[in-house]
Curated annotation (Swiss-Prot):
Family: Belongs to the archaeal phosphopantothenate synthetase family.
Name the UniProt record assigns to this protein: 4-phosphopantoate--beta-alanine ligase
InterPro entries from the UniProt entry: PPS/PS, PPS/PS_sf
Source organism: Methanosarcina mazei (strain ATCC BAA-159 / DSM 3647 / Goe1 / Go1 / JCM 11833 / OCM 88) (Methanosarcina frisia)
Subunit structure, interactors included: Homodimer.
Length: 253
């Protein structure tokens, strides 16, 4: 990867680009993943490359859902494996969630490489190599594990496709997404939509999970029952508008 100076004002964003590009070279990330990363980065600009209040609100609710779940699962694709495998493993360890590889552009080689990447980051078990169940979808994201996504009650699906998100919700699952675009079908379909950068979101969630594990079950239930996803998305859009107004005022446009 290119050596990026730590004092560069956009160090984290440039590092993310390099990680996804490296993922493509390693065979972990698909070429299409580069496009998805660029699209996400453009929305990150719009929120000021920070975790907004609406994002933090959704992240806390998401952690509560994971901690209360009977069979929580974190779904991992190529971009997630390239960007934050260590953070996935940390969050899974704290919440007791299983990890499952699920890909749109699926090959046995890619699945193997992603599993090895996650295990190198500390994962003891990763599902997805030998899927034995299927969702009602016409592409390879339908292939899932009966121990994982298929029977999960709560699924964290970072950087998700809208159609699979919709199908998982139809199956009665609590679906948590991380998507920087509050207007996407994924964001509008999910149960809990986190409008934040993947790396920031997973880091925040691990921190919250460590703290919230000590809370009473009633407090976690309250977080879930009072959570309003429409409010989250509305506030995320308002935060974009406010950031743009601030930038316009600062530049004199």
């Amino acid at each position: 990867m290119t050596d990026i100076p730590h004092d560069h004002p956009r160090y984290e964003s440039l590092l993310a680009r390099e990680k996804v590009a490296a993922g493509v070279k390693m065979g972990i990330t698909s070429i299409q993943g580069l496009i998805a990363q660029g699209r996400g980065e453009s929305f990150d600009y719009l929120i000021g490359e920070r975790s907004t209040e609406s994002a933090l609100y959704a992240e806390r609710a998401a952690v509560a859902a994971l901690l209360l779940a009977e069979n929580p699962v974190i779904s991992v694709n190529g971009n997630v494996a390239a960007l934050a495998p260590d953070k996935v493993v940390t969050l899974a360890d704290i919440t007791g969630a299983r990890i499952e590889v699920n890909l749109f552009h699926r090959t046995d080689t890619r699945v193997h490489l992603i599993i090895e990447q996650l295990k190198a980051s500390g994962a003891a078990e990763v599902l997805g190599k030998n899927p034995d169940a299927s969702l009602e979808l016409s592409h390879d994201r339908r292939l899932v594990s009966s121990k994982g996504i298929y029977t999960a009650d709560v699924v964290l699906v970072p950087l998700e496709d809208g159609d699979r998100c919709e199908k998982l919700v139809e199956m009665g699952k609590t679906v948590i997404t991380i998507d920087l675009n509050p207007l996407s079908r994924t964001s509008k379909t999910a149960t809990i939509s986190i409008v934040d950068n993947l790396t920031r979101a997973l880091g925040n969630m691990a921190k919250f999970a460590q703290e919230m594990k000590k809370e009473r079950k009633e407090e976690l239930v309250k977080l879930i029952t009072t959570y309003d996803n429409k409010r989250t998305l509305s506030e995320a859009i308002s935060e974009i508008q406010e950031h743009l107004k601030t930038m316009a005022a600062e530049t004199g446009y």
